[in-house]
A protein has these predicted regions:
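Helix-loop-helix hairpins in multi-pass membrane proteins, especially solute transporters
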Residues: 1-110, 137
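12-transmembrane solute porter fold
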Residues: 10, 135-145, 149, 158-333, ...
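Structural signature of transmembrane alpha-helices in multi-pass secondary transporters
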Residues: 19, 47-58, 62, 111, ...
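Small-residue-rich packing faces within the transmembrane alpha-helices of Major Facilitator Superfamily
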Residues: 20, 82-89, 150, 250-251, ...
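Hydrophobic transmembrane-helix bundles of small-molecule transporters
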Residues: 48, 70-182, 188, 206, ...
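Small-residue (Gly/Pro/Ala) motifs that create kinks and tight helix-helix packing interfaces
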Residues: 60-69, 122, 229, 316, ...
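Transmembrane-helix exit segments and adjacent C-terminal regions of multi-pass membrane proteins
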Residues: 287, 352-413
Length: 413
């Protein structure tokens, strides 16, 4: 891509195009599942398969990216999407059923701008406050501007005759719970992947390919457990499946925090637990979202769930990434007062600075920087584990809906 046009603006625009395409495609796929399968148990199983493929595909991204970066030009991580999309389009067109849409619904351009600027303002404020020398005035201004835009967006949607987001859907607690679980699970997974990929490459010294292969248990476990969770939801209920999945994910993160310096087997077992928890949580959350709206609202419900995934990723990177930077900067003890202040920004900066230092000072700086990063790494994993555990407890405290299936009676002879 850069060979075609060596411009940062072009790269950002291309990334924005990818995001728009994904935002249009993912809700449509889930809405199709909702339309095609009418039996509730079949629909739950189909959603489980959908969730397992979606979560596995997202987690496989680092693996494929590692392979491409190992053997090809870095722009190949973008160009690989072209043949994949072309093949998927050719295979999908004959199989996708025709579903009548609401073509009269207008596009709310102002509402789209309000929510976009609102999220950008809040996210920027959080990132600015976590910087080494934050501009508090700018951060407060961005936060206030962002919250004002979000308030105006909510007010506009509540008054609109055909809103982008019908907030009345959230009156259904099962729907709202599914959206919340999807957001929280994505926050934890993306935050974990952010720090773990850096730990594998910058601390353990793995190549991008080996680092991608190391996290392969997550998508594989998600792929296997998704259909199983879809089969369990109609029998055990959404609450139980979500609670169990969140607890398994929390256990996986806790295990990784305790075993990251241990044998590889212990780390891989923790990653499998995390994959099982994430796959189960995504399936149960998707089922709760899609089975608690009428068919006419399925497209909007699918879009809301997709937003929860994307927003969870943004919040996970922002909050847990900020926590990582904060703990790293506070934990780093510099071997010399003459070192540039940017070594406290990140481990990557410290390693770059070390390349221009005397061997003894460089070796000491690298050692101390990696120790500080280890502390930040553990802090992020523990925070993500606590988030999933508290979410599981919140789900557990919710009353079981009358329409949710009771657990099967014990088998008696």
């Amino acid at each position: 891509m850069r060979r075609l046009r060596p411009s940062a603006a072009a790269l950002i625009a291309a990334r924005a195009g990818l995001a728009v395409g994904a935002a249009l495609m993912m809700p449509a796929t889930l809405s199709i599942v909702r339309h095609v399968f009418q039996d509730e148990r079949e629909r739950a199983l189909a959603i489980g398969i959908w969730a397992s493929v979606a979560s596995a595909g997202a987690a496989l991204g680092p693996v494929v990216g590692g392979v491409l970066l190992e053997f090809f030009w870095w722009g190949s991580v973008f160009l690989i999407n072209v043949p994949v999309v072309a093949i998927a389009l050719l295979l999908a067109l004959p199989a996708i059923p025709a579903c009548g849409g609401q073509s009269r619904r207008p596009w709310d351009a102002l509402g789209s701008l309000q929510v976009m600027f609102g999220l950008v303002g809040v996210v920027y404020a959080i990132k600015e406050l976590s910087a080494r020398a934050p501009d508090f005035g700018l951060a407060v201004l961005a936060a206030l501007g962002g919250m004002l835009c979000l308030y105006l967006f909510v007010r506009r949607q509540r008054r609109a005759r055909e809103p982008m987001i019908d907030f009345a859907l959230f009156r259904n607690r099962r729907f709202a719970r599914g959206v919340a679980v999807a957001l929280v699970a994505t926050m934890a997974l993306v935050g974990m992947e952010l720090v773990f990929s850096q730990h594998l490459q910058l601390v353990q010294g793995l190549t991008p390919l080996k680092a991608g292969l190391f996290v392969l248990p997550i998508p594989l476990a998600s792929l296997v457990v998704g259909p199983l969770a879809g089969w369990l939801v109609p029998r055990w209920g959404e609450n139980r499946v979500m609670c169990a999945s969140l607890l398994l994910g929390s256990a996986g993160l806790l295990g990784l925090a305790l075993s990251y310096q241990s044998a590889t087997g212990a780390q891989l077992a923790s990653l499998v637990l995390l994959g099982v928890g994430f796959g189960g949580a995504m399936t149960a959350a998707s089922t709760a979202v899609m089975l608690n709206v009428d068919e006419q609202s399925s497209g909007m419900a699918a879009a809301i769930e997709d937003v929860s995934y994307e927003l969870g990723g943004v919040i996970g990177v922002t909050l847990l990434g900020s926590l990582m930077s904060l703990v790293y900067g506070m934990s780093l003890r510099l071997p010399s007062a003459e070192l540039p202040a940017r070594v406290r920004d990140s481990l990557d900066d410290a390693l770059l600075v070390a390349e221009g230092l005397a061997p003894e000072v460089a070796s000491r700086l690298v050692e101390l920087a990696r120790q500080a990063f280890d502390q930040a790494f553990v802090a992020v994993l523990l925070a993500a584990a606590a988030l999933l555990f508290l979410s599981a407890m919140a789900v557990l405290r919710q009353p079981r809906p009358a329409t949710e299936p009771a657990p099967p009676a014990p088998h008696t002879r």
